[in-house]
Amino acid sequence: MKYAEEPEYAHGTPLCAGVLLVNLGTPEAPTAAALRPYLKEFLSDPRVVEIPRALWWLVLNGIILNTRPRKSAEKYAAIWTSEGSPLKVHTEKQAKLLKGWLGEHAAAPVVVDYAMRYGRPGIPEVLARMKAAGCDRILVLPAYPQYAASSTATAFDAAFDWLRRTRNQPALRTLKHYHDHPEYIRALAANLRDYWQMHGRPDVLVMSFHGVPRYTLDKGDPYHCECQKTARLLAAALGLEPGQFRVTFQSRFGRAEWLKPYTDKTLEALGREGVGRVDVVAPGFTADCLETLEELAMEGRASFLAAGGKEFHYVPALNEHPQWIAALGRIALANLAGWLDEGWTPDADEASRQLSRSRALALGAQR
């Protein structure tokens, strides 16, 4: 194996901890040309599609990549903003705000950056950049509160694959999940309360999570259970009775059975039942994206109203909500434990590095 190029080791180099915020990814533009490589990378991941590779290669390259890019591009065009893809815009803002929060609350400097599992900026690219900036300890913090092999695990795969090709490796920590973390639940509840204070409350709250194939649950993936726990804790925090909320799953792809009940079918049923107002929130999406802004806010609204519903509200994701940024910061700090020197000061750090360098040079080191 050929390892990545390394600069010559220099004694006394400033070192620090880092946090890498990882989200799923987005195409570079809302066009079929940009969607094709993005979808190819995403759908070629065996963590995402678990069927025999040879068969899937034929389906992907012979059918899907010749039809789906145009359809997906139309959906992305409906939500694209002047700043770009909403997912990328929100994730970048979250990283900047998290950096500011940690700058105020962490005992020592922390580098914060973000990466996408698919598309750019990629995980290997950003990890290399953080290492070059002096990070010798990096926490990989997924934007997915609920663990799933098809989201969380594949992000870790990419990080570990980069680590495997790196000669002078930084220490790497991963955060598996925070679906039941009190700070996360409080942020979700605060976000909903803020929305309801301005727009009133619904007859039914639909908590929609991204779906995964049913067989993943049967094979041991805890995702379904973690979604249910998040929903239960959020309902309790809001004081909701069982009849006041539903837990559903969206974004089904292909013909296989996915986790149920499906969000679209539930919205249609609520409309037929004559429910006056439905609010939809997506607790598993910490940043608004195609699945929330187009699939829920547009398609979901149309389905509910067409079935006889009267009023539909999509409650925005956590995005840059102040309580979410604080929650993200506290979650990060807890997982940086032992990596941040409580007694750190710039002067003490400089003195320690200079002493280390002078000792190394005295022993014959060149740098």
Curated annotation (Swiss-Prot):
Protein origin, superkingdom: Bacteria
Biological processes per GO annotation: heme biosynthetic process
Enzyme Commission number: 4.98.1.1
Keywords: Cytoplasm, Heme biosynthesis, Iron, Lyase, Metal-binding, Porphyrin biosynthesis
Catalytic activity: heme b + 2 H(+) = protoporphyrin IX + Fe(2+)
Pathway: Porphyrin-containing compound metabolism; protoheme biosynthesis; protoheme from protoporphyrin-IX: step 1/1
UniProt enzyme class: lyase
Keyword rRNA-binding belongs to the record: no
Subcellular location per the Swiss-Prot or TrEMBL entry: Cytoplasm
Positions of Fe cation binding: 210, 291
Any single GO CC term annotated in Swiss-Prot or TrEMBL for this entry: cytoplasm
A GO term for molecular function: metal ion binding
Function as written in the Swiss-Prot or TrEMBL entry: Catalyzes the ferrous insertion into protoporphyrin IX.
Family the UniProt entry places it in: Belongs to the ferrochelatase family.
HAMAP family listed in its UniProt record: Ferrochelatase
Protein name per the record: Ferrochelatase
